[in-house]
């Protein structure tokens, strides 16, 4: 038995900040912003965090799956911005969503790829008949040091997937592979508030090498070629990197543009590529095939082949789309953004 996506859901905070405002405040050159291919980024409100956003996106996924949450046998939560350093978010979500306590809950960590690894694991549990349904969440209020280039892209969003049996799926997971190595491109040491980049490793040795290796491995193991896919979705640390991957693979931009989210909301880390996948599922038609390749620093990439079924059309209508959340926005100032994300420190 194959596994598939029975339900999917997204959530993006309403607040946005123009990345040019951040660049101007810190004296970053306009060319830096242009090179990133970004316009705005999503900012959490003062009462939003990776847990509350995960609840929102999971409720949308449950609407599309049209199942009782008590039927879910595992909840895996991928994030770089957990509310607690030591206390799982998955347990909070299990009780908040009404998932049975006779279930497995765990938080996944692999930079921006924790949720993607979770998708592979839950898919395997469904295929092995260990569970009927599993919930996978990628949710982040991404951290960045004020004035760092990373602050232009680090964003907030959440995406959730309910994985279940093939005969109930709006899209079937046909195949999946992973590619992993010890590449120090990005890290945050224990006790440090913000991550740092190993600049020489960020592009070619990390992002490009791992995504291209995972995609080529998927092709080799399954006999796929570019023309077999209608959509391609890659991890989106900025607006330019996924387009460069497409050019390296000689993929038409028409097959990439529908899955782009970072030019509009920035990079929400664990919700990046998987949010792009949700955006494609919102519009995909039966019989179309999607390749999605998330990436996580440190470093690793997964590549999935996903085949859309005729059940997709009914599910698309049952919850708000990614585009709905992208267009639902309120622009805020840097001072508001700094306040809601805790960049101001008050000492008494």
From Swiss-Prot:
One of its GO terms (biological process) is farnesyl diphosphate biosynthetic process, mevalonate pathway. Keywords: Acyltransferase, Isoprene biosynthesis, Transferase. Pathway: Metabolic intermediate biosynthesis; (R)-mevalonate biosynthesis; (R)-mevalonate from acetyl-CoA: step 2/3. It catalyses: acetoacetyl-CoA + acetyl-CoA + H2O = (3S)-3-hydroxy-3-methylglutaryl-CoA + CoA + H(+). It is an enzyme of class 2 (transferase). One of its GO terms (molecular function) is acetyl-CoA C-acetyltransferase activity. The active site is at 80 (proton donor/acceptor), 112 (acyl-thioester intermediate), 235 (proton donor/acceptor). Pfam families: ACP_syn_III_C (PF08541), HMG_CoA_synt_N (PF01154). Its EC number is 2.3.3.10. SUPFAM superfamilies: Thiolase-like (SSF53901). CoA binds at residue 240. (3S)-3-hydroxy-3-methylglutaryl-CoA binds at residues 29, 112, 153, 202, 235, 267, 297. Interacts with acetoacetyl-CoA thiolase that catalyzes the precedent step in the pathway and with a DUF35 protein. The acetoacetyl-CoA thiolase/HMG-CoA synthase complex channels the intermediate via a fused CoA-binding site, which allows for efficient coupling of the endergonic thiolase reaction with the exergonic HMGCS reaction. Belongs to the thiolase-like superfamily. Archaeal HMG-CoA synthase family. Catalyzes the condensation of acetyl-CoA with acetoacetyl-CoA to form 3-hydroxy-3-methylglutaryl-CoA (HMG-CoA). Functions in the mevalonate (MVA) pathway leading to isopentenyl diphosphate (IPP), a key precursor for the biosynthesis of isoprenoid compounds that are building blocks of archaeal membrane lipids. This is Hydroxymethylglutaryl-CoA synthase. The lineage of its organism: Archaea, Thermoproteota, Thermoprotei, Sulfolobales, Sulfolobaceae.
């Amino acid at each position: 038995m194959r596994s598939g996506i029975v339900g999917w859901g997204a959530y993006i905070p309403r607040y946005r900040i123009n990345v040019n405002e951040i660049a101007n405040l810190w004296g970053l050159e306009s060319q830096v912003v242009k090179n990133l291919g970004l316009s705005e980024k999503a900012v959490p409100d003062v009462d939003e965090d990776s847990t509350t956003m995960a609840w929102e996106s999971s409720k949308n996924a449950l609407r599309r799956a049209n199942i009782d949450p008590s039927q879910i046998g595992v909840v895996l939560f991928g994030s770089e911005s957990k509310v607690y350093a030591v206390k799982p978010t998955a347990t909070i979500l299990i009780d908040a969503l009404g998932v049975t306590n006779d279930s497995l809950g765990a938080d996944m960590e692999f930079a921006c790829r924790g949720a993607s690894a979770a998708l592979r694991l839950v898919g395997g549990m469904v295929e092995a008949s260990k569970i009927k349904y599993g919930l996978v969440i990628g949710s982040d209020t991404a951290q960045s040091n004020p004035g760092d280039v990373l602050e232009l892209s680090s964003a907030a969003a959440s995406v959730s997937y309910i994985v279940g049996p093939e005969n109930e799926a709006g899209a079937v997971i046909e195949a999946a592979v992973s590619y992993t190595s010890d590449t120090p491109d990005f890290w945050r040491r224990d006790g440090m508030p913000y991550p740092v980049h190993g600049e020489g490793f960020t592009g070619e040795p990390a992002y490009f090498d791992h995504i291209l290796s995972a995609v080529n491995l998927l092709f080799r193991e399954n006999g796929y070629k570019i023309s077999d896919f209608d959509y391609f979705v890659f991890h989106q640390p900025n607006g330019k990197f996924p387009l460069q991957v497409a050019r390296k693979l000689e993929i038409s931009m028409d097959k990439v543009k529908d899955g782009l989210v970072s030019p509009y909301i920035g990079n929400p880390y664990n919700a990046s590529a998987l949010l792009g996948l949700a955006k494609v599922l919102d519009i995909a038609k039966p019989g179309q095939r999607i390749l999605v390749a998330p990436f996580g620093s440190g470093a690793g990439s997964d590549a999935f082949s996903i085949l859309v079924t005729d059940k997709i059309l009914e599910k698309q209508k049952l919850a708000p789309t990614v585009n709905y959340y992208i267009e639902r926005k309120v622009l805020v100032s840097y001072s508001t953004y700094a306040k809601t994300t805790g960049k101001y420190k008050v000492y008494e």
